[in-house]
Amino acid sequence: MKPRFAFSISATDGAARAGVIAMQRGEIRTPAFMPVGTAATVKAMRPAEVRAAGADIILGNTYHLMLRPTAERMARFGGLHKFMGWDRPILTDSGGYQVMSLSALTKQSEEGVAFKSHLDGSRHMLTPERSMEIQRLLGSDIVMAFDECPPAGVDARRAEASMERSMRWAARSRAGFDAGEEHAARSALFGIQQGSLDEKLRARSAATLIDIGFDGYAIGGLAVGEGQAAMFGVLDFAPAQLPADRPRYLMGVGKPDDLVGAVARGVDMFDCVLPTRSGRNGQAFTWDGPLNIRNAKFADDQEPLDASCGCPVCTIWSRGYLHHLVRAGEMLGAMLMTQHNIHFYQDLMQAMRDAITTGRFAAFRSDFAARYRRA
């Protein structure tokens, strides 16, 4: 019988870890990058293409799905997996970040967040209990606790108050998750560390989460405008504050060099809209750095996006053809650019897993930094 949730570390190299998360719907190799399926789709890609690119798990957005098509409707279809045709693990976020960043007229209280939908202005209330209910209706494999994510640059008092509220919501999320006994028996719940950039606040947050008890732990409150140096500053201490025998998930990150730097600091899981959003806007990620295929210099370029990439896009089509598709606004352009980017991100994760396993991660990191030119 497949386990509900089990995490094993197969190799370490410095703080970097390679391992496997085993769940009933399949294994997730770590370090792992999760393509984002905001509205029950990884934009511009079919599920089979996402899997063929190397993804073991994708992410779904509770906020977007609760508004359209609604969690209750997806439950009638048999859950998010059947609805979208993806049979492997899905992690769903709690909806807290999107509520604060996308919704108009939000009102926070100890109970939760009251908000108006950005789609039609309808009124909703999202609480830890409702977030757990929605994620249960979706049939999520990895459920995220409901938290409050303050913007970058908040003062110490606001950061502390926000962290403490998130910890109270974490306890309510735990109780709400456990109340759904049938779903809880086959899925996992992750807690989210908060505390802004403050080491002591994050230590308190981690201690509280560990006391509550979770299957995995996320590092929240980053990638909100603080910049890479500040983010890495937090990652120099935050992962070590969390249990070594549980997965560590850095939410909303990020650029390829962010991923390499975070893995070097002990992070196991990532998600970000960047590869899909960038693909739709004509930006490709390559081992030599990002390139904007819209630029006129690519019009006559007969080379692939990345000569060292083995994805279907790079083995068939030229930069010149992709330039034409994107400039002409053809749907295929967004599809092919996205497909390449998802392949590149998964190839990057595999390269890091291999480097950790063979004890050469430091050399890989140095070589990557020397070659990759950040836009």
From Swiss-Prot:
GO terms for molecular function: metal ion binding; tRNA-guanosine(34) queuine transglycosylase activity. The active site is at D93, D271. It is an enzyme of class 2 (transferase). GO terms for biological process: queuosine biosynthetic process; tRNA wobble guanine modification; tRNA-guanine transglycosylation. Its cofactor is Zn(2+). The keyword tRNA processing applies. Its EC number is 2.4.2.29. Binds 1 zinc ion per subunit. Disulfide bonds: none annotated. Substrate binds at D93, S94, G95, G96, Y97, D147, Q194, G221. GO terms for cellular component: cytosol. Pathway: tRNA modification; tRNA-queuosine biosynthesis. Catalyzes the base-exchange of a guanine (G) residue with the queuine precursor 7-aminomethyl-7-deazaguanine (PreQ1) at position 34 (anticodon wobble position) in tRNAs with GU(N) anticodons (tRNA-Asp, -Asn, -His and -Tyr). Catalysis occurs through a double-displacement mechanism. The nucleophile active site attacks the C1' of nucleotide 34 to detach the guanine base from the RNA, forming a covalent enzyme-RNA intermediate. The proton acceptor active site deprotonates the incoming PreQ1, allowing a nucleophilic attack on the C1' of the ribose to form the product. Belongs to the queuine tRNA-ribosyltransferase family. This is Queuine tRNA-ribosyltransferase. It comes from Sphingopyxis alaskensis (strain DSM 13593 / LMG 18877 / RB2256) (Sphingomonas alaskensis). The gene is tgt.
